[in-house]
Regions:
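Glycine-rich beta->alpha junctions and the first turn(s) of the following alpha-helix
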Residues: 2-8, 12, 180-222
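Residue-level signal for inorganic ion chemistry
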Residues: 20, 74, 103, 123, ...
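Short secondary-structure junction/hinge motifs that connect adjacent elements
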Residues: 27-49
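Internal helix-loop-helix
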Residues: 49-108, 116, 152-158
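A short, Trp-centered hydrophobic/proline-enriched beta-strand micro-motif
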Residues: 116-128
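A generic structural signal for well-ordered coil/turn residues at beta-strand boundaries
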Residues: 117-119, 133, 156-157, 166, ...
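A short core secondary-structure module
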Residues: 124, 147-179, 184
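Cytochrome P450 C-terminal beta-domain/meander region
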Residues: 131-145
Length: 222
């Protein structure tokens, strides 16, 4: 048995490495750390043009249909160059979350748009990992209210947000004025975390429960 990257995987790594090498420099990283978004917008545009956003999206929905290994190889390059790319939430966790028979309608609606770069998905699941007693999220009659912190890929006006309440996943569309998103200061200024405030926002339940939550968390950690 051969434990090595295939020729296609090596080509993928080489292509991403060359792209980030030409884009990422110390001046750009400093501007990102100071709060400028020009650099992150540039990197995300290049990712979209290379079709990387749809890496885990099935081919039938406009993506590449590749797997978590290929996603981790790209993640390695993002870390190597400290690139402020929208990746883990948008391009890894969300496709895995929606790409199953139980959520076929949501997948067909949103995954093609993630693949072509016309949609950004943020992920706010800190509620599952470390719920705060004094604040958090509640759902009543299909509407979510409350505050979720440490959301990822949510700093550039996402179109949808994947969140969790009481071991259930939900998808919230942000095309309304009932959501407030603000950036949280962290040690790594190139990797922005966000606080999201929901004001009675309509939510679509994502079927899968605790098993699916654990699955996307594992994928994000890889």
């Amino acid at each position: 048995m051969e434990f090595a990257l295939s020729e296609e995987q090596e080509l993928l790594v080489d292509s991403v490495s060359k792209m980030l090498s030409s884009s990422c420099n110390i001046d750009e990283l400093r501007s990102q750390a100071s709060g400028e978004k020009t650099f992150s917008n540039k990197v995300n545009k290049e990712f979209s043009e290379m079709g990387l956003n749809g890496l885990l999206v099935p081919e039938r929905l406009g993506g590449s249909g590749l797997g978590i290994l290929e996603a981790s190889l790209i993640g390695e390059q993002i870390g190597k160059f400290a690139a402020p790319a929208i990746w883990i939430g948008n391009s890894v966790m969300t496709p895995i979350c929606l790409n199953n028979d139980e959520n076929k309608d949501l997948a067909e609606e949103w995954l093609p748009r993630i693949a072509d770069g016309s949609c950004i998905s943020g992920v706010a699941i800190n509620e599952y990992i470390s719920k705060r007693e004094d604040n958090g999220l509640t759902i009543d009659n299909g509407e979510i209210s409350g505050i979720s912190i440490f959301a990822i890929d949510s700093e550039t006006n996402p179109d949808i947000i994947i969140t969790v309440i009481q071991d259930e996943l939900y998808l919230v569309e942000t095309a309304n004025e009932k959501i407030e998103i603000s950036n949280l200061p962290t040690i790594d200024s190139t990797r922005v975390m966000s606080e999201i405030v929901f004001h009675s926002c309509s939510a679509h339940k994502i079927n899968g429960g605790k098993d699916l939550i654990e699955k996307i968390i594992d994928a994000g950690r890889v």
